[in-house]
């Protein structure tokens, strides 16, 4: 078991103290394990306070080894780290890629001892990410793909990476990023690509909160 690092997320449907506890217990049964390494709260909406209290208790019981959050923007992250919180989030998983680099967000997380974790490090290929001239040219210097350049860039920034693939060859490629190092010039060139705009959606928009609320209630009605 110790050779695997297992992460799971709590969806909004299971927020609130009792529901969150029940959700983790169900995950433990399904995974057939005594503990989960990291449990994340998926969104900063609904009763995430109650859910977080449940995770703190499960942490103290040894059933989870670390608590994390996802998509928590700076003010909500600060709220989760202050006010006598028993356990500070270990990570905050946010969209992070060359076009949305989250530099200020990372600085804010470091202030509270929270590690940044990137979801959508490749932006799901949006905006021609894999054929971006800057990334492709840097890759040619090291005989690496644009995807490998992105992963290496994140590693050198101290960003934890959550990337996935269903293709074995791409999984293998994703591991081959420890045999080269980007120069300062390379890092600056990638830094210049930042637009600070999401390739997906803005969690601070009221319309986005309304969308999540509608989705949760539609799921309950099924």
Segments predicted by a language model, with ranges:
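CE4/NodB-like, metal-dependent polysaccharide N-deacetylase domain
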Residues: 20-40, 57-61, 83
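Local beta-strand N-terminus motif with an aromatic residue
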Residues: 3, 33-36, 64, 89
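A short, structured active-site edge motif that brings together acidic residues
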Residues: 2-14, 37-44, 71, 95
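Short, acidic/polar
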Residues: 16-31, 50, 77, 101
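Hydrophobic alpha-helical elements and their junctions with loops/disorder across both membrane
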Residues: 14-15, 34, 99, 146
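Beta/alpha (TIM)-barrel catalytic core signal, keyed to glycine-rich beta->alpha loops juxtaposed to Asp/Glu
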Residues: 43-222
């Amino acid at each position: 078991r110790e050779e695997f690092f297992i992460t799971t997320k709590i969806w909004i449907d299971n927020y609130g103290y009792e529901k969150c506890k029940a959700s983790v217990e169900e995950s433990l049964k399904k995974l057939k394990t005594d503990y989960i390494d990291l449990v994340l709260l998926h969104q900063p909406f609904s009763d995430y306070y109650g859910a977080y209290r449940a995770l703190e208790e499960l942490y103290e019981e040894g059933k989870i080894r670390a608590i994390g959050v996802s998509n928590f923007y700076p003010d909500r992250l600060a709220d989760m780290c202050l006010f006598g919180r028993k356990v500070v989030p270990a990570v905050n998983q946010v969209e992070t890629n060359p076009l949305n680099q989250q530099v200020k967000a990372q600085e804010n997380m470091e202030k509270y001892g929270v590690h940044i974790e990137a979801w959508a490090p490749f932006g799901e290929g949006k905006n021609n990410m894999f054929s971006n001239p800057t990334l492709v040219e840097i890759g040619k210097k090291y005989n690496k793909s644009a995807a490998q350049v992105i992963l290496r860039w994140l590693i050198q920034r101290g960003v934890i990476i959550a990337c996935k693939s269903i293709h074995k060859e791409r999984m293998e490629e994703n591991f081959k990023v420890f045999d080269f190092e980007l120069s300062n010039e390379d890092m600056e060139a990638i830094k210049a690509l930042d637009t600070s705009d999401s390739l997906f959606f803005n969690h601070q928009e009221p319309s986005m909160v309304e969308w999540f609320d509608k989705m949760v209630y539609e799921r309950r009605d099924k």
